[in-house]
Amino acid sequence: MSSPAAQSNSSSSQSQSAAQQQQQQNQKANVNNTHDNKNAAATTGTAAGSGSGGAAGSAGTQQQGQGGTGTSSGPSSPTKRSTISTKERVIDSVAFPPSRKLTCADVFDARTGKPQHDVLKQHFILEGRIEESAALRIIQEGATLLRTEKTMIDIEAPVTVCGDIHGQFYDLMKLFEIGGSPATTKYLFLGDYVDRGYFSIECVLYLWSLKITYPQTLFLLRGNHECRHLTEYFTFKQECKIKYSERVYDACMDAFDCLPLAALMNQQFLCVHGGLSPEIHELEDIRRLDRFKEPPAFGPMCDLLWSDPLEDFGNEKNSDFYTHNSVRGCSYFYSYAACCDFLQNNNLLSIIRAHEAQDAGYRMYRKSQTTGFPSLITIFSAPNYLDVYNNKAAVLKYENNVMNIRQFNCSPHPYWLPNFMDVFTWSLPFVGEKVTEMLVNVLNICSDDELMTEESEEPLSDDEAALRKEVIRNKIRAIGKMARVFSVLREESESVLQLKGLTPTGALPLGALSGGKQSLKNAMQGFSPNHKITSFAEAKGLDAVNERMPPRRDATPSPAEEGQKSLSAAAAAAANANANSING
């Protein structure tokens, strides 16, 4: 058998000189050609011969394609390079979000004029959006309905009670799977539909569309996050501006002002977001409240949204009904005695509230001595809260005087960078690390004496020279420190993103980066430096700062607010005095 080069040349009618000339041209052309073009090689080999000769021709052409000379010398190993198409998505298994926004004609039924919530559901699951006009119409029509409802609404059983949602739209879909279709199930939501999660506007639009469609069987109460103060501080306002506009955000705030504050379920249960107030003694006190406003920093409306039961509820060390809520920075803690006193005075069985994350999704507190029923029930419906709590969620179904708790776990959801960060901002640490690394290397090339050299021939004194050298050294150290910060940001990007996700403003704790990996690790571990955030208690401890009422811009209260604050304090003191006299 002839050599591969000879086999290839034998199929050509060209002269020997022409073949040599062609071979030289191939050698010259292949100096810069390092790609393994197998398809072209196979085609050329087939044209060069058939059968075994064709295979030999193919081998010879492949060798020439790698820069070989076409001789019978040993073949060189091919250089393989992967190529990525710039016209196709790299991860094609993830569906691309719909690019077309739904119009009012798509969203609203032409016959009934009501939103098609099934259409919205499927569109939002795919991360689609709707036109601003459609979003505004849903929000405003929902607000019109909410405005007609009483401050404390009356609901008859059967009913399913749900706690905090916090923008976890995909878990809200799971909630309706567990609780039943809104078309056939009566629902009561206890507030906190927005903030912290990254799909808050989808939750609002979907729940409002359900409210418009089923106004007599779906009820929405106000939570402490349904206000301007918290949504500006946390994520909802930013989300509205990114996904829609500030006009949509303003419409949501106006709608939130219309939400009822409480519900009386089956004439037996008071349902509210937070809890009791020292200024609310009877149910009529709730009915008389003016709810159509931004919640104040203190007073009965604030307490209904912000108050909590004592941590040692049912095992208190003193007899006070109300104490200052140091965890929230506003409102009160209420005791077991205060709860039982309120229930007895209003002939109620229990208080059902939300407002606090629970490991199991719910908590039954100490039973009333008169009824034998839990005096207080907390329900929380956001599983794996903030993607770090690892808690279960729950809904409460009450029917035929039987209370049933149904738990559920979190559902997968699309990933957003913390605080809706874009990919360019996210990539800055990678770019910054390289820039500072280059700058440090440039500065390290020169010695201190070279950096001291100036055009001026005036000599510096020893003290001036030493001071100048120290200034230069400090600058190099500062740049080196900045380089370490960027290096930590790049290497520990996942930890940084998780820590940013736990802060409302997206700012990291001071010193978390400059101290290197260990300080970042300690910050991630929160209050337990020997453990990672793997338990519900540790996640709750780390997130406690975000459960407080954020500082207000107008920190100095108005005279009216001062008077209201004094009234609240006096009411709490009177309630505690009454409790002491009863116990005495």
Curated annotation (Swiss-Prot):
Zn(2+) binds at residues 192, 224, 273, 355. SMART domains: PP2Ac. Belongs to the PPP phosphatase family. PP-2B subfamily. One of its GO terms (molecular function) is calmodulin binding. PROSITE patterns: SER_THR_PHOSPHATASE (PS00125). It holds the Pfam family Metallophos. Residues 1-89, 546-584 are annotated as: Disordered. Gene3D superfamilies: 3.60.21.10. Its EC number is 3.1.3.16. Residues 546-555 have a biased composition (Basic and acidic residues). Binds 1 Fe(3+) ion per subunit. The active site is at residue 225. Residues 1-33, 569-584 have a biased composition (Low complexity). It comes from Drosophila melanogaster (Fruit fly). It is an enzyme of class 3 (hydrolase). Calcium-dependent, calmodulin-stimulated protein phosphatase. This subunit may have a role in the calmodulin activation of calcineurin. Its cofactor is Fe(3+); Zn(2+). Residues 48-57 have a biased composition (Gly residues). Fe cation binds at residues 164, 166, 192. Interacts with sra in a complex that contains Pp2B-14D. This is Serine/threonine-protein phosphatase 2B catalytic subunit 3. The keyword Calcium applies. It comes from the Eukaryota. The modification Phosphothreonine is found at residue 61.
